[in-house]
Amino acid sequence: MNRTEKEQVISELHEKMAKAKAAIVAEPKGLNVAVVTDLRKKLRDAKIDYRIVKNTLAARAAKGTPVEPVADRFVGPTALVMSYDDVVTPAKLLADFMKDRENFVIRTAIIEGKVIDAKGVQALAKMPGLKELRGQIAAMIAQPATKLARLVGTPGQQLARVVGARREQLEKQA
């Protein structure tokens, strides 16, 4: 890789690191091409970047970005997973991926400016994602309106039942 290519990689990585809400630094040892391709596809479908990075270039790119505090963890084989919207989804996908693989290890992460360790990433993976939270909030907002509609409708239903029962009673007498 010549100097121009390196500068281009640094510039591209710097731009992505600056926009990332979540960046997870992992160690991908002993993974075959099919497994990595499958992981990349799952992450890409969730709009998450996965890159095997050259440590020196990644460390230079991290300067002046939210990822800078974890730049010292760019040692050995390094994969960088970056998300620009949801901070929980990458943790969930990586935790799911790691269930069957001991070789893939999360070193550290930076989530919205806060450095967390591998255990913190595992804990984050157990939290509901952005879409799930939105669904829960929508359900909580809709619930009082549903209850109110039921309460408003109940007296009318009861009155209709009483009138119907009285009508049947009068019909039987006639």
From Swiss-Prot:
Record GO biological process: translation
GO molecular function, one term: large ribosomal subunit rRNA binding
Keyword terms of this UniProt record: Ribonucleoprotein, Ribosomal protein, RNA-binding, rRNA-binding
Family: Belongs to the universal ribosomal protein uL10 family.
Organism: Anaeromyxobacter dehalogenans (strain 2CP-1 / ATCC BAA-258)
NCBIfam families: PRK00099.1-1
GO cellular component terms, A-Z: ribonucleoprotein complex; ribosome
Protein name: Large ribosomal subunit protein uL10
Described purpose of this protein according to its UniProt entry: Forms part of the ribosomal stalk, playing a central role in the interaction of the ribosome with GTP-bound translation factors.
Encoding gene, per UniProt annotation: rplJ
Assembly and oligomerization: Part of the ribosomal stalk of the 50S ribosomal subunit. The N-terminus interacts with L11 and the large rRNA to form the base of the stalk. The C-terminus forms an elongated spine to which L12 dimers bind in a sequential fashion forming a multimeric L10(L12)X complex.
Pfam families linked to this entry: Ribosomal_L10
Gene3D superfamilies named among the record's database cross-references: 3.30.70.1730
CDD domains hit by this protein: Ribosomal_L10
